[in-house]
UniProtKB/Swiss-Prot annotation:
Catalytic activity, EC: 6.3.5.7
Its biological purpose: Allows the formation of correctly charged Gln-tRNA(Gln) through the transamidation of misacylated Glu-tRNA(Gln) in organisms which lack glutaminyl-tRNA synthetase. The reaction takes place in the presence of glutamine and ATP through an activated gamma-phospho-Glu-tRNA(Gln).
Family under the similarity heading: Belongs to the amidase family. GatA subfamily.
Lineage: Bacteria, Pseudomonadati, Pseudomonadota, Alphaproteobacteria, Hyphomicrobiales
One Pfam family, short name: Amidase
Source organism of the structure: Methylorubrum extorquens (strain PA1) (Methylobacterium extorquens)
Subunit composition and interactions: Heterotrimer of A, B and C subunits.
Protein name: Glutamyl-tRNA(Gln) amidotransferase subunit A
Alphabetical list of SUPFAM superfamilies matching this protein: Amidase signature (AS) enzymes
Length: 493
């Protein structure tokens, strides 16, 4: 029999409904797995008492025939989502010990639907990173290893704890956020599925902000179906978030069985970047073949401003971050380091509380917003953003239903491998994903195969605004063709 923590979310839902096991039993199975997996450092804090109390409520609901959509399903929460009464740190020393008195909209909707909270998941500090190496609470280690090697690998970032926990069976699914690829890249690195919904599909209320015009919440799970189930609960209008869109939430789970017959899938020629590994190109071609065999038409398209997306993103995002992170000053909450006066306290607190990568991005952002450089950098980057959005609009107007690209330019790299590199080398991990955030579009990463060293690789599908249903249908087609990747054996236990 499959261990309870190794079930998919859909299988666990069906098992709980059939009373094959209790919510308490599946919660305890996950808590035991978390205890055995401390070497991965996927969780910043586990919440066993809360999990078991929530599971008991779920068992009572199931016994009365009052089960809610996610009744009794144990989930991990990225530590960027405010959780009432539970430390919420954003992976930063400056928020050490901060316990919110409120719950994020996304997590409150999950609890409304009966989900069980296992704990808070590790991440790059303030979601700034592509490897989960910038967390003040230690690096998260990927459950994957290269064949014949014991060298630790990164799980991707910033949602590395979410992806690692899902891949290592430490939760059935996890919340995550995506500003430039922070759901899709770690999902690709860990053989999991991750979707960044359309900007505005999920409320940002109660999520610690990085770049407000780019941030969007979404799920990471082990299958396309599981992601569809979770997004159905996470999405929805919230009047507290002025960017939250007031439109009905579709039945995403029903969409996975639609298939792709009659759809047109675009292949952007600009994504064939110089130096792309041959195995990434082969996987991309294979993905197009799978969709063609399932009845889709494959069409080459042009997204001419793609080459400017990464530099424009690394102007817009740090600019917004420098503004958003100005609120952390040691006055009302979090770390406070005394100084000789109020200005000294601000300086000392921020110097001690922020990590190196966060300081770098705050400085870049402050620089591009300064009077002498605002027009030269920030305004120009926003103009590029508009052109990128128009490229996608033109592609969809030409009859394309979704766009297929690689999710990442490589498989996962080793812990510390990029530590001494130019920061731009790390930023290049987002080369295939940032355009989606700049245009506010939905994008999903789905596992499609393994590289020569046995590490997972993902394909990305990009959709029309608020057409996540087509993405789920196409992603399910790829998952069916590729087969589900066997997740790694528990070498850490």
């Amino acid at each position: 029999m499959t261990a309870l923590n190794e079930l998919t979310l859909a299988e666990a839902r069906d098992g709980l409904k059939a009373k094959d096991f209790s919510a308490r039993e599946i919660a305890q199975a996950h808590l035991d797995a978390i205890d055995r997996a401390k070497a991965l450092n996927a969780y910043i804090v586990a919440t066993p008492d809360r999990a078991l109390k929530m599971a008991e409520v779920s068992d009572q609901k199931i016994a009365k025939g009052e089960a809610r959509p996610l009744e009794g399903l144990p989930l991990g929460i990225k530590d960027l989502f405010a959780t009432q009464g539970v430390d919420t740190t954003a992976g930063s020393k400056i928020l050490e010990g901060f316990e919110p008195h409120y719950e994020s909209n996304v997590s409150s909707q999950l609890w409304r639907d009966g989900a069980v909270m296992l704990g808070k998941l590790n991440l790059d500090e303030f979601a700034m990173g592509s490897s989960n190496e910038t967390s003040a609470y230690g690096k998260t280690i990927s459950p994957w290893r290269r064949q014949g090697s014991y060298a630790p690998l990164v799980p991707g970032g910033s949602s590395g704890g979410s992806a690692a926990a899902v891949a290592a069976h430490l939760c059935l699914g996890a919340t995550a956020t995506d500003t430039g690829g922070s759901i899709r890249q770690p999902a690709a690195f860990t053989g999991t599925v991750g979707i960044k919904p359309t900007y505005g599909r999920c409320s940002r209320w109660g999520i610690i902000a990085y770049a407000s015009s780019l941030d969007q919440a979404g799920p990471i799970a082990r299958t396309v179906q599981d992601c569809a189930i979770l997004l159905g609960s996470m999405a929805g209008h919230d009047p507290r978030d002025t960017t939250s869109v007031d439109m009905p939430v579709p039945d995403f789970e029903a969409a996975i069985s639609r298939g792709v017959k009659g759809l047109t899938i675009g292949i952007p020629k600009e994504y064939r970047v110089e130096g792309m590994p041959a195995e990434i190109q082969r996987l991309w071609d294979q993905g197009a073949d799978w969709l063609r065999e399932a009845g889709a038409t494959i069409k080459e398209i042009s997204l001419p401003h793609t080459q400017y997306a990464l530099p424009a993103y690394y102007i817009v995002a740090p600019a917004e971050a420098s503004s958003n992170l100005a609120r952390y000053d040691g006055v009302r909450y979090g770390l406070r380091v005394p100084g000789k006066d109020i200005a000294g306290m601000y300086e000392n607190t921020r110097a001690a509380g922020f990590g190196r990568e966060v300081k770098r991005r705050i400085m870049i952002g402050t620089y591009v917003l300064s009077a002498g450089y605002y027009d030269a950098y920030y305004v120009r980057a926003q103009k590029i953003r508009t052109l990128i959005k128009r490229d996608f609009e033109a592609a969809y107007a030409s009859g394309v239903d979704a766009i297929l690209t690689p999710a990442t330019p490589s498989a996962a790299f080793g812990i510390g491998e990029m530590a001494s590199a130019d920061p731009v080398e790390m930023y290049l991990n987002d080369v295939f994903t940032v355009t989606v955030n700049m245009a506010g579009l939905p994008g999903i990463s789905v596992p499609a195969g393994l590289d020569a060293q046995g590490l997972p690789l993902g394909l990305q599908l990009i959709g029309r605004p608020f057409d996540e249903e087509t993405l789920f249908a196409a992603a399910q087609t790829i998952e069916n063709a590729a087969g589900r990747i066997s997740l790694p054996k528990a070498w850490w236990a």
